[in-house]
Amino acid sequence: MATSIARLSRRGVTSNLIRRCFAAEAALARKTELPKPQFTVSPSTDRVKWDYRGQRQIIPLGQWLPKVAVDAYVAPNVVLAGQVTVWDGSSVWNGAVLRGDLNKITVGFCSNVQERCVVHAAWSSPTGLPAATIIDRYVTVGAYSLLRSCTIEPECIIGQHSILMEGSLVETRSILEAGSVVPPGRRIPSGELWGGNPARFIRTLTNEETLEIPKLAVAINHLSGDYFSEFLPYSTVYLEVEKFKKSLGIAV
């Protein structure tokens, strides 16, 4: 009888010790447990409009507000400031800056100003010609070019990394090679190829070459249409749905 009582007392003491150990561990765990974050209800990411660029595309200056035609494509990270007009069918590509703070800048019909170009205009021109920067219709301005208070007549190609200074004039159906520098007041005659620093006459363009100039501008205009559709207020899924319906013979 005494042996049984001793065994029961030992079991009770052991169980009490085990309970105390577990209780101490649980208390320690509660103290070291990190506070749970307070979750808040917020719109899903597909319903939030994000803008990581941190820059403004259209910058009004005083009474002057840049004007962009409805069907003209202007890339999201382009800067248009002041007296800038972008006409129908034209395109201004990524990273270009058009500063119309001192005078007018015009990008004509179906012309294109490519990546990282800088277009500016001075108060006045030393040649007496208009100080505005005028890019007429069917003109292709290559990437990284710098244009300041110059006039480019219809159907011209300005090569990449070219510089056109104040008062320079590029007449119709002319081509300027890449890396060319046109000094102030220099005139590039019609139908000629010029290049170099400073720009010099190289040769006369053939009839076939002059006919290809507007075709290049039109091709770039068609390419800009693919980019233009990606920046509609809504996604372009409906375009794929319409194509799928047409492939099945369903009227859209």
UniProtKB/Swiss-Prot annotation:
Residues 1-29 form a transit peptide. CDD domains: LbH_gamma_CA_like. GO terms for cellular component: mitochondrial membrane. GO terms for molecular function: metal ion binding. Zn(2+) binds at H120. Keywords: Membrane, Metal-binding, Mitochondrion, Transit peptide, Zinc. InterPro entries: LbH_gamma_CA-like, Transf_Hexapept/Carb_Anhydrase, Trimer_LpxA-like_sf. It comes from the Eukaryota. Its main location: mitochondrion. It is found in: Mitochondrion membrane. Substrate binds at R99, G100, D101, Q114, E115, R148, Q160, Y227. It is a peripheral membrane protein. Belongs to the gamma-class carbonic anhydrase family. Component of the mitochondrial oxidoreductase respiratory chain complex I; element of the extra matrix-exposed domain, which is attached to the membrane arm of this complex. Interacts with GAMMACA2. Involved in complex I assembly in mitochondria and respiration. This is Gamma carbonic anhydrase-like 1, mitochondrial. It comes from Arabidopsis thaliana (Mouse-ear cress).
